[in-house]
Structure formats: structure tokens, C-alpha cells
A protein has these predicted regions:
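Conserved helicase RecA-like core
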Residues: 1-181
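Basic Arg/Gly/Lys-rich low-complexity intrinsically disordered segments
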Residues: 93, 167-217
Length: 217
């Protein structure tokens, strides 16, 4: 028997905080960096944690953001511990506006009152989505979790929605609507159905969104 039992609550891997506002923006893959820069600038976000799938992708995104005048730094497995700590400190003190990270490198990150997390690329593991956005909306503060989804990532979104047992809201931003004729490049192994099937589905979704979706700047 326990003399002084205590109840410890652990957040399950299939739930997200109510304080986090989630949104998915469909966009062509090659326009993701452009949309990311637009969102950071137009929404005036001063502290944004951005997740990519690969180390190389995180470094390339830093270069793209700098071209748009947004100070950014990356933390990934190729960086030394000293370099990671410097990047994190610059992010916390406001010298760097966007911190680009991989899932592995971001483990253990603790940033108080982080205002926004962006999934530049959706994770292969749905549980990683929960871990990513769990870094905002802490201690009663509100936060935003934005996902930039290209057509070839729809299956990843479905996996996330299945895990969370909910549909995530989607919104098309005017000027960044996906092109239904864009070439499809999947990150997963090829399946039996062809690209024409995917394009037909995409065109059908375009018609649906045209009728009911919201277009905003």
C-alpha cells in the first residue's frame, strides 16, 4: 500500500491540447517556402518553430527564408551541440525569427510561450504530429499549429486524422491554391493506382473547395 499516493496525468499520444488552434493549408510542394514566408510576414509571427522531414531540407529552407528577409536557423543531426545551442538561444532571444528543426533534433526542446508551430512537411509517423504541435499552447497559453500540405501528403494527413479521431480544418489561401495538373511525386512506395487516379481525385476536390472553401489573404 502507498502511504501518500499521487495521481500523475500523462498526455496520451493521440490527443492534442484544446489551447492549440490547428489549420491545414493545401499548397503545391514547390510553393511551400513561398507560402511559409508569406504567412510569417503577413501574420507578423515573431517566433515560429518549423518542422521538416530531413536534415538537408531544414538547411535548404533556412536559405530560402533568408532570401525573403526572414532570419532563420536550423537544428539537425549534422549540427554540433554548440551550433544547436547557439541557434536555440538566438531563437529564444528573438535574434532568429524561425527555427527549422527535424523531429530528432527537436527532442527535449522547451520554449516558453511559443506562439506557432508549422509543419512544413507532414511527418511519416502520425504520433510525431502530436509531439510537434505539443510545443505550443502550453501552461494555459494559446498557440497555433499550421500544416502546409502538398497533394502527395494527403495520406499522411489521413493517418493523423485517424489517430486524433477528428477532421482537421483546411483552408485555401488566395493566390496559393494547389494546381490539379501539377506532377505528383510521392514520398511513399508506389502503389497500384496510377497518377491519373490521383489527379482525378484532386480535380474533384478542387470543385468541392471552390464551392465551400474559404479564400483569404
Amino acid at each position: 500500500m502507498l502511504n501518500k499516493p499521487k495521481e500523475v496525468q500523462v498526455t496520451p499520444t493521440n490527443s492534442t491540447a484544446d489551447t492549440v488552434e490547428q489549420m491545414v493549408y493545401p499548397v503545391d510542394k514547390h510553393r511551400k517556402s513561398e507560402l511559409l514566408a508569406y504567412l510569417i510576414g503577413s501574420r507578423n509571427w515573431q517566433q515560429v518553430l518549423v518542422f521538416t522531414k530531413t536534415k538537408q531540407g531544414s538547411d535548404e529552407l533556412v536559405k530560402e527564408l533568408k532570401k525573403d528577409g526572414i532570419k532563420a536557423a536550423s537544428i539537425n543531426g549534422d549540427k554540433s551541440q554548440g551550433a544547436r545551442l547557439r541557434a536555440l538561444e538566438e531563437f529564444k532571444t528573438g535574434k532568429v525569427r524561425a527555427l527549422i528543426a527535424t523531429d530528432v533534433a527537436a527532442r527535449g526542446l522547451d520554449i516558453e510561450q511559443l506562439e506557432c508551430v508549422i509543419n512544413y512537411e507532414l511527418p511519416f509517423k502520425a504520433e510525431d504530429y502530436v509531439h510537434r504541435i505539443g510545443r505550443t499552447g502550453r501552461a494555459g497559453h494559446t498557440g497555433k499549429a499550421i500544416s502546409l500540405m502538398s497533394m502527395d501528403e494527403e495520406y499522411l494527413l489521413k493517418a493523423i486524422e485517424t489517430l486524433l479521431d477528428t477532421r482537421l480544418p483546411q483552408e485555401w489561401l488566395q493566390g496559393y491554391e494547389p494546381d490539379p495538373n501539377a506532377p505528383l511525386k510521392e514520398d511513399r512506395p508506389r502503389q497500384s493506382r496510377g497518377r491519373s487516379s490521383d489527379k482525378r481525385k484532386m480535380k474533384a476536390k478542387l470543385k468541392i473547395h471552390a464551392n465551400r472553401g474559404k479564400n483569404k489573404r
